[in-house]
């Protein structure tokens, strides 16, 4: 289950055992739905079998008109960038910095999420949105998709410590804010993403990404204690 304070994001987390990401087109009750459900790319066991269990992935549609599913992730992004209303042209909802999570504070960037047996708190350490010109392989890279795709020049390699460090560095560099958190290569990660707000065609590669690490309870699954270095976030 995912529930983010100050938003209407409050949904069960689903997983399609067929591996076909079927909850993109059906709701949590299995009924056909254009809004879909919140779902994992792979459950923990499957992700572990592919060697990508260190980065679990959660996604849902950006239901802009109804302002549901993961649309309000954009509100979190925008209010933390100093915006006062939703950037989507048909939303324009006023954004209250006193209600939406303040990612500069530990309380605001720490979210309670329970997925496939992991019931814990997760800390946001990077977030950013890419536009419709972004290479498609970014989605594969960010989510550690465990299969080659020659058409977009993506080659899957089972992550090792060097890859994880490179991946962390890439996400920190691209983050739209310095949140003052530097993850460890031994952390348990969670990548959450949804479609972009202003580049929203069916074939667009625009996405909004949030990168989190498990902090409570601290994960030791990948050799660490989930400790991280925190500095003062940039103003």
Residue ranges and their predicted role:
Residues 1-235:
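Solvent-exposed, non-transmembrane regions of membrane-associated and secreted proteins
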């Amino acid at each position: 289950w995912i529930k983010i304070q100050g938003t209407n994001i409050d949904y069960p987390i689903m997983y399609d055992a067929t591996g076909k990401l079927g909850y993109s087109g059906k709701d949590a009750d299995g009924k056909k739905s254009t809004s879909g459900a919140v779902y994992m790319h792979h459950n923990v066991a499957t992700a572990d079998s592919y060697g990508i269990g260190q980065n679990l992935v959660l996604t849902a549609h950006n239901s802009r008109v109804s302002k549901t599913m993961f649309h309000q992730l954009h509100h979190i992004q925008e209010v933390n960038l100093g915006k006062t209303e939703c950037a989507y042209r048909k939303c324009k909802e006023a954004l209250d910095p006193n209600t939406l999570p303040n990612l500069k504070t530990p309380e605001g960037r720490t979210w309670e999420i329970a997925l496939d047996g992991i019931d814990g708190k997760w800390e946001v350490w990077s977030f950013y949105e890419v536009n419709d010109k972004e290479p498609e392989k970014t989605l594969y890279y960010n989510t550690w998709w465990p299969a080659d795709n020659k058409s977009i020049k993506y080659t899957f390699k089972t992550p090792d410590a060097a890859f994880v460090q490179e991946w962390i560095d890439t996400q920190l560099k691209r983050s739209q804010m310095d949140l003052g958190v530097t993850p460890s290569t031994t952390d348990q990660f969670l990548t959450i993403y949804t479609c972009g707000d202003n580049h929203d065609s069916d074939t667009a590669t625009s996405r909004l990404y949030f990168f989190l690490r498990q902090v409570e309870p601290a994960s030791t699954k990948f050799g660490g204690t989930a400790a991280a270095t925190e500095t003062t976030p940039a103003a």
